[in-house]
Regions:
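Helix-to-loop junction immediately C-terminal to a conserved catalytic motif
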Residues: 48
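Conserved ABC transporter NBD signature motif
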Residues: 56-64, 76, 111-117, 219
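The feature captures the beta-strand-to-loop junction immediately N-terminal to the Walker
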Residues: 33-35
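ABC ATPase C-loop
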Residues: 151-152
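Conserved ABC ATPase signature
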Residues: 134-138, 142
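ABC-type ATPase nucleotide-binding domains, specifically the catalytic core motifs of the NBD
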Residues: 12, 68, 93-112, 123-125, ...
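Conserved catalytic motifs of ABC-family nucleotide-binding domains
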Residues: 155
Length: 237
């Protein structure tokens, strides 16, 4: 589904990615793990169209999307849940969710969008209770739920998640990742960039370890979780 080949990118004038190559198959969750500054967010920005690579190709569903705009990538089926959540604070929960479905609300296909509301409220029942509440008044965990739900309202073919555990309490992180695993069981294709290596490897079926803008190790998630170097560097055991 997604194929990245020899991806290079610069951030603030310095090269941040040095030739990344990886794939995400349809219906699979893949994780990018590594310390802060490893290149995870830069990779996500390139994939979502927010940052233009300096070299390399990004292919999605057989089409070269390397130079497509963010809007064109959303239209193609790629949706990003950004680092830091970035909900629309002055808008209600429902209005935030409608923003995720704007491409279908604009032609007034409300019947299909209604089913999506039911889907995300089933995943995140707390949001149903807060549909009229301003997003800025939600807790950090509720805002992360909203950010994921908003992305799902676009019916993505590939869901990109950048550091979904950042700044959240451990119990909230546990709930968020339980929902991500549920999405994986439903066959939702996901690419997860995450510093919480333990949770990422429990959720994904395959992982890539990033360091200094390079992929330094790649294997199935179970193998990576058992690697001594990965445990020492990222799992704290």
């Amino acid at each position: 589904m997604l194929e990245v080949r020899d991806l290079h990118a610069a951030y603030e004038g310095k090269e941040a990615l040095h030739g990344l190559s990886f794939t995400v198959a349809q219906g699979v969750c893949v994780c990018l793990i590594g310390a802060n500054g490893a290149g995870k967010t830069t990779t996500m920005r390139c994939l979502s169209g927010l940052l233009r690579p300096t070299h390399g190709t990004i292919t999605f569903a057989g089409a070269n999307i390397t130079t497509l705009s963010p809007a064109a990538r959303v239209a193609a089926g790629i949706t990003l849940v950004p680092e830091g959540r970035r909900v629309f604070a002055p808008m209600t929960v429902r209005e935030n969710l409608e923003m995720g479905a704007y491409r279908r609300l604009w032609p007034r296909r409300h019947s299909t969008v209604a089913a999506d509301f039911d889907f995300v409220f089933d995943l995140f029942p707390r949001l149903r209770e807060r549909t009229g509440q301003l997003a800025g008044a939600l807790s950090g965990g509720e805002q992360q739920m909203l950010a994921i739900a908003r992305a799902l309202m676009s019916r993505p073919r590939l869901l990109l998640l950048d550091e979904p555990s950042m700044g959240l309490a451990p119990l909230v992180v546990k709930d968020i990742f339980a929902t991500l695993r549920r999405l994986g069981e439903m066959g939702v294709s996901m690419l997860l960039a995450e510093q919480n290596t333990r949770m990422a490897l429990r959720t994904a079926s395959r992982g890539y370890v990033l360091a200094g803008g390079l992929i330094v190790q790649a294997a199935d998630a179970t193998t990576l979780a058992g690697e001594r170097a990965v445990r020492d560097a990222y799992l704290g055991v």
